[in-house]
Amino acid sequence: MTLRRVARALIVLPLAGISAFAVIGAAQAPAGPAAAGDPLIAGFKSTYAASVSDAVEIVTGKNGTMRSDMKLMAGTNMVGRAVTSLAKPAPAAQATATLAVKHSVEIIDEAKPGEVGVIVMEGTLDIAAMGNLMATAAVERGMAGMVLDGAIRDMWDIRRMGLTVYARAKSPRTAVGHYATVAKNIPVECGGVTVRPGDILVADEDGVVVVPQERASEVLKEAQSIDSRESGMYPFIRQFKSLQEAIKKFNRI
């Protein structure tokens, strides 16, 4: 249970004795456009990255959370299915303006509304995986956001657009002349976690979690169970003024 949620839940609103516990669900920021007719995406939008992180480990026995340097650079919460692109170092002749970002541009131009673009720049945090032109296209395609194992540039413009972007670094340096994409919609290692096309990414201020698509229903059910237990802990803590007793009773922290 995160301190953010405890603090939010312990605040009592001066309105007819109604506590913040009653409005926790309403206070959560939306996670971006939903893929039409995808109940799993809708379900994950009602939970938190922290709960989903715990749930992935419980269900799969493996970590699904990207490294802590995968930071929210722009936008807000994000949930969506992944589309992927991989870039590697390349000679200048093979890293032209077209080839440097070929597959990354393709996953954006082919994206369905609500999808999340995942771009991996193998071996560097000093070269930008995308800038404002690619971000503009992502917004126009209705993408939920982007996750970059690499750097981002043109932050001044991307923040203005409102596109959600997570990245490991910022750098103004171009990929042209240095890197070229080699494949799209393949499994990639992003932030220390394998991401496959169709996996569900759940991200908020805490970080980015990858939900394996074949276990998504189980993970969602577990995450909802975690949130339900935590919801019961808030009034217990207020009543008994003891976090230790709440942990013992609900077996949750």
How should these model regions be labeled?
Residues 15-33:
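Bacterial Sec-dependent signal peptides at the C-terminal "C-region" and cleavage site
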Residues 207-209:
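Channel- or pocket-lining gating/hinge segments that regulate access to a cavity or pore
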Residues 29-197, 211-253:
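Feature captures the catalytic cores and cofactor-binding loops of soluble hydro-lyases/lyases
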Residues 1-14:
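Bacterial N-terminal signal peptides that target proteins for export
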Residues 2-5, 20, 43, 249:
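Intrinsic disorder/low-structure terminal segments
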